[in-house]
Amino acid sequence: MIPETFFLSPEIVKAQQFGQPIVALESAVITHGLPRPYNLELACELEAIVRHENVTPATVGLIDGKVHIGMSLAELQRLASEPKTRKISRRDFGIAIASKECGGTTVAGTLIAARIAGLRVFATGGIGGVHRDAPFDVSADLEELGRSPLVVVCAGAKAILDLPATLEVLETMGVPVVGFQTDEFPAFYSIGSSLPVTARANTPAEVANIARAQWKTGINSAVLVVVPPPAEYALPAAEVEIYIRKALQEADAKSIQGAAATPFLLNRVSELSGGASLQANLALLRNNARLAALIAKELSISAEGRL
């Protein structure tokens, strides 16, 4: 039963009725992750990429206190231009719904909504994780990954985080990290981090088989599929590290903490890299959406993929 606080677009309802593949897309990247006009352009482009593979996109977000699964162009435009939107994670749903607010769902927020709506595949840029020099500052994304039976396609965790610690928490949460055509955990802007993944898959069908096997066993955690950014846009890890350290120093000097920290750090890394990190971010988002669509098609081949 879908809660009355949810609204599934007619397109999503139809896709579910006919067993057609669907890919969930987050909206925090629209409301908080990218500057205008890139945010709306990218939201539309990601949906187009998914549609190109004959898969239905389901952008998730809050409009006037309703959790939308699938959005119209007008709704995407509103989220992209609304001056005050809340960043929606697990703790924020009740507040935003009661206040009839608009909001962009984080990885955690999107996982919750997608799970309730019965979706099985989700594409994002990078997950949250354990913050550097702040081991008690752990993203809610990790816990939701541990209890959400979805395939989540990403480029690893955001490079501003403590990647080894993030992988340790994922292990604790029972989340397998599957490298797509890679044996290393990607570092978001960079191709590799020298950190090993749990397993490797070379095709979308292999990913689908892993997910089916996990869920048939009754293990309801996510399968985290990590994909390196496209090589032509990837940045050298050492170069990115210089930008991150400088951005962290500035954030500390300005006492920027909590939910404001990640947007500030990502924006400063973009400025320090002359926009190269932004272009890498856009490229990996496109790449992840395409792969997620291919995996969704493989899962939809068998009714077992729609448990």
Name each region found by the language model.
Residues V23-L25, P57-L62, G103, V121-G126, ...:
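General beta-strand structural signal in soluble alpha/beta enzymes
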Residues M1-G19:
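N- or domain-start disorder-to-order transition segments that initiate the globular core
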Residues Y189-K216:
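Anionic-ligand binding region
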Residues A117-T182, V197-R200, I210:
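Phosphate/pyrophosphate-binding betaalpha-module
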Residues S27, H32-L34, L40-I95, K216-A231, ...:
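Glycine-rich nucleotide/cofactor/substrate-binding loop typically near the N-terminus or early
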Residues V13-Q17, I22-V23, H52, A113-I116, ...:
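Solvent-exposed alpha-helices and their adjacent loops that cap or buttress functional pockets
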Residues I219-N287:
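A C-terminal functional module that forms or caps the active site or interfaces directly
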Residues S72-P149:
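Divalent-metal (Mg2+/Mn2+/Ca2+)-assisted nucleotide/phosphate chemistry catalytic cores
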